[in-house]
Swiss-Prot record:
Catalytic activity: L-methionine + ATP + H2O = S-adenosyl-L-methionine + phosphate + diphosphate
SUPFAM superfamilies: S-adenosylmethionine synthetase
Enzyme class: transferase
Localization terms from the record: Cytoplasm
Residues reported to bind Mg(2+): E11
Subunit note: Homotetramer.
Cofactor binding note of this UniProt entry: Binds 2 divalent ions per subunit. The metal ions interact primarily with the substrate. Can utilize magnesium, manganese or cobalt (in vitro). Binds 1 potassium ion per subunit. The potassium ion interacts primarily with the substrate.
Cofactor(s) this protein cannot do without: Mn(2+); Mg(2+); Co(2+); K(+)
Residues binding ATP, per UniProt: H17, D169, G170, K171, S237, G238, R239, F240, D248, R254, K255, A271, K275, K279
Pfam families attached to this UniProt entry: S-AdoMet_synt_C (PF02773), S-AdoMet_synt_M (PF02772), S-AdoMet_synt_N (PF00438)
Name by which UniProt lists this protein: S-adenosylmethionine synthase 2
Expression (tissue specificity): Expressed in vegetative and reproductive tissues.
Binding site for K(+): E45
Length: 374
């Protein structure tokens, strides 16, 4: 009897996608604040449209931060250097509307900086999920890994000059054929590869397809997953000259599935970018990813989902949940007990154990581009 299989798809976006541009600006602001003041409380949002970028939100910090410079530097480093590519970093309008963190939140979460780390409460209510699978060395889903790496490859060959016709904006999508091995996911082959990338006016559609196959797809997707039936959609809409904020509006926090597991596992709905570690949308998601990855890496399960939940101002989590999808070597309740013994889910202690108060050198900015806790 033939093995029953199914298709699953994950997508990613390039650093020049308008939403991802906003994520990176918000995290560049966070980096700058934490670099000078590790106790900074940051909730920074960004939006963008043609010839305009706005940063807004609540920030309480001792850092001296030039928000406009951060915006322009980030846009320039991505490659937005003229209106022709979607945004001119040096001449676009930059709007800043930053206020202090609410005093009500400040006293409830960290007692206006008087609480010990173990007593710091969650910055808000919410539930976060961590996921891990043994199908790749990164303990990430293959569909998500390949989509993410294709996007990174597009950026690399654009910036190193291999494909000079490329521009910053773009999206990738990978469909993988899997079979379910008693709860574990086993990838068989890549069914479809989709790339839509911004380009200049000089390149032809045939040249785009040839370059993408040779310089982007071939180095990223292992040959064993490609066959004569693999489908390639390379700029299927035709031309894609107008991209970046000129093509679409962008907003922080609209690519949360791309930032996590590509549609696998689950998601609590909270975004990461522009948030300091007291915001459990970020730190809580990071620690449950570490827990799930540890479970799989240590052979307790082949696939695992971990959930944690919080109440605003309360240090201890309300709940911790483990689901091994039936792949556990021991019962899930025993895995849960091990997780609770091994991991401290209090927000202040997460910041210490994962070193989340250290900014600078593009640390959180890099998180905006690729999931760096792989």
């Amino acid at each position: 009897m033939a093995t029953e299989t199914f298709l699953f798809t994950s997508e990613s976006v390039n650093e020049g996608h308008p939403d991802k541009l906003c994520d990176q600006i918000s995290d560049a602001v966070l980096d700058a604040c934490l670099e000078q003041d590790p106790e900074s409380k940051v909730a920074c949002e960004t939006c963008t449209k043609t010839n305009m970028v706005m940063v807004f939100g609540e920030i309480t910090t001792k850092a001296n931060v030039d928000y406009e410079k951060i915006v322009r530097d980030t846009c320039r480093n991505i490659g937005f250097v003229s209106d022709d590519v979607g945004l001119d970093a040096d001449n676009c309008k930059v709007l800043v509307n930053i206020e202090q963190q609410s005093p009500d939140i400040a006293q409830g979460v960290h007692g206006h900086l008087t609480k010990r780390p173990e007593d710091i409460g969650a910055g808000d209510q919410g539930h976060m999920f961590g996921y891990a699978t043994d199908e790749t060395p990164e303990f990430m889903p293959l569909s998500h890994v390949l989509a993410t790496k294709l996007g990174a490859s597009l950026t690399e060959v654009r910036k190193n000059g291999t494909c000079p016709w490329l521009r910053p904006d773009g999206k990738t999508q990978v469909t993988v054929e899997y079979y379910n091995d008693k709860g574990a996911m086993v990838p068989i082959r890549v069914h479809t590869v989709l790339i839509s990338t911004q380009h200049d006016e000089t390149v032809t559609n045939d040249e785009i397809a040839a370059d993408l196959k040779e310089h982007v797809i071939k180095p990223v997707i292992p040959e064993k997953y490609l066959d004569e039936k693999t489908i390639f959609h390379l700029n299927p809409s035709g031309r894609f000259r107008h991209g970046g904020p000129h093509g679409d509006a962008g907003l922080t926090g609209r690519k949360i599935i791309i930032d996590t597991y590509g549609g696998w596992g689950a998601h609590g709905g909270g975004a990461f970018s522009g948030k300091d570690p007291t915001k459990v949308d970020r730190s809580g998601a990071y620690i449950v990813r570490e827990a799930a990855k540890s479970i799989v890496a240590n052979g307790l399960a082949r696939r695992c989902l971990v959930q944690v939940s919080y109440a605003i101002g309360v240090p201890e989590p309300l709940s911790v949940f483990v689901d091994s999808y039936g792949t556990g070597k021991i019962p899930d309740r025993e895995i849960l007990n091990i997780v609770k013994e091994a991991f401290d889910f209090r927000p202040g202690m997460i910041s210490i154990s994962l070193d989340l108060l250290r900014g600078g050198n593009g640390r959180f900015f890099e998180d905006s581009c690729i999931w760096t806790f792989w």
